[in-house]
Amino acid sequence: MTSWQRLCWHYRLWTLGCYMLLAILALKLSLRLKCDFDAMDLDSEEFQSQYCRDLLYKTLKLPAKSSINCSGVIRGEQKAVTQALLNNLEIKKKQQLFTEADYLRMTADCEHFKTKRKFIQVPLSKEEASFPIAYSMVVHEKIENFERLLRAVYTPQNVYCVHMDQKSSEPFKQAVRAIVSCFPNVFIASKLVSVVYASWSRVQADLNCMEDLLQSPVPWKYLLNTCGTDFPIKTNAEMVKALKLLKGQNSMESEVPPPHKKSRWKYHYEVTDTLHMTSKRKTPPPNNLTMFTGNAYMVASRDFIEHVFSNSKARQLIEWVKDTYSPDEHLWATLQRASWMPGSDPLHRKFDLSDMRAIARLTKWYDHEGDIENGAPYTSCSGIHQRAVCVYGSGDLHWILQNHHLLANKFDPKVDDNVLQCLEEYLRHKAIYGTEL
């Protein structure tokens, strides 16, 4: 073999070696970049890869309705907030929300609906998969609000009971049923009631869902209850961590009632289309219970919910409050201070928990808004007020996200869709990347 032939032979071997090395590197890279979305765990080494997270986020990123600076709105930058508020004024005139007919059409193909509407269809971590949450969702109108709320809290390991007001419109009920039918872990409450504002029926709607959820095969740990104007301000992963920290305790507003609220259970109330106070005085609470006041929303352990149905003293209190005014605002608060209820707090006033200290729901009340430097708990609402409660605007989002609550109330895309869009973007980005926008 001549020196030229030997040189050519060595060159071929070198080239072949280079190709083999490149092939091995390509194989290793492809294995590293393989993202198993069916057995996903964002805490695993595989999903520490920026490639996998980017791919997942691209798949689940929600389409923006408006070109606003959500990062700036979330940080509370005045220029971004002002632009979002002005943009909201412009789009409100021509805004078209999805109708019941739209949802009937979209859900004709469930897989397409879930993919197009960007529902998260796999648990994002092993920790979340092993800690399912139950939701009691009471709704009566505004179908897009319901679907966006469901999408925001939905994961396949959780379980969701939806109570529709029996007097809701037929198109609304059909659309809710159509949406629910697309998910194996979402169902309609087995018993529906007509809900009258501030009456017992609001509690009964939740109780119907609670009873159904206790029959579910899903081994949920905690229950959260929602209404149609709620929205989460924490990701599911953050909720799981917060619930684990409770270690079996509940978290809900429960305080000594001010004098003006005591009349709510001193007199018998009658229900027609609305609630009417009579002159008939009620007997004292059963079992010499001390009454407390709070709100309709709770973060309650499974043990607590089970005792609502099985404990005779709890059942007696439930019967007693049925003819009171807004029983949802004192039933749960009082049970939370009963020593025989799991996860409850002691009676002493030092254990009072305000709505700002509980994690169940963040709400801005009109009569508490003002200048923080002068002692107000929060600044003025940037949206509008409904029954003295702030319907949030874009200017509220920075404040909202500084708080420890799991959900906030009230949101309405008809009032300000941009605050919802930015909150949705924030939650989806944080769910995938673990960081803010």
Curated annotation (Swiss-Prot):
Membrane topology (UniProt): Single-pass type II membrane protein
Modification after translation (UniProt): N-glycosylated.
Disulfide bridge partners, by residue number: 70-227, 161-381, 182-209, 390-422
GO cellular component terms, semicolon-separated: Golgi membrane
GO MF annotation: an example: acetylglucosaminyltransferase activity
Enzyme Commission numbers on file: 2.4.1.102, 2.4.1.148, 2.4.1.150
Glycan-modified residues: 288
Lumenal side of membrane: 31-437
Record's subcellular location: Golgi apparatus membrane
Segments passing through the bilayer: 13-30
Alphabetically ordered keywords of this record: Disulfide bond, Glycoprotein, Glycosyltransferase, Golgi apparatus, Membrane, Signal-anchor, Transferase, Transmembrane, Transmembrane helix
Pathway where this protein functions: Protein modification; protein glycosylation
Family assignment from sequence similarity: Belongs to the glycosyltransferase 14 family.
Annotated PANTHER family: BETA-1,3-GALACTOSYL-O-GLYCOSYL-GLYCOPROTEIN BETA-1,6-N-ACETYLGLUCOSAMINYLTRANSFERASE 3, GLYCOSYLTRANSFERASE 14 FAMILY MEMBER
Function: Glycosyltransferase that can synthesize all known mucin beta 6 N-acetylglucosaminides. Mediates core 2 and core 4 O-glycan branching, 2 important steps in mucin-type biosynthesis. Also has I-branching enzyme activity by converting linear into branched poly-N-acetyllactosaminoglycans, leading to introduce the blood group I antigen during embryonic development.
Record's protein name: Beta-1,3-galactosyl-O-glycosyl-glycoprotein beta-1,6-N-acetylglucosaminyltransferase 3
Record organism: Mus musculus
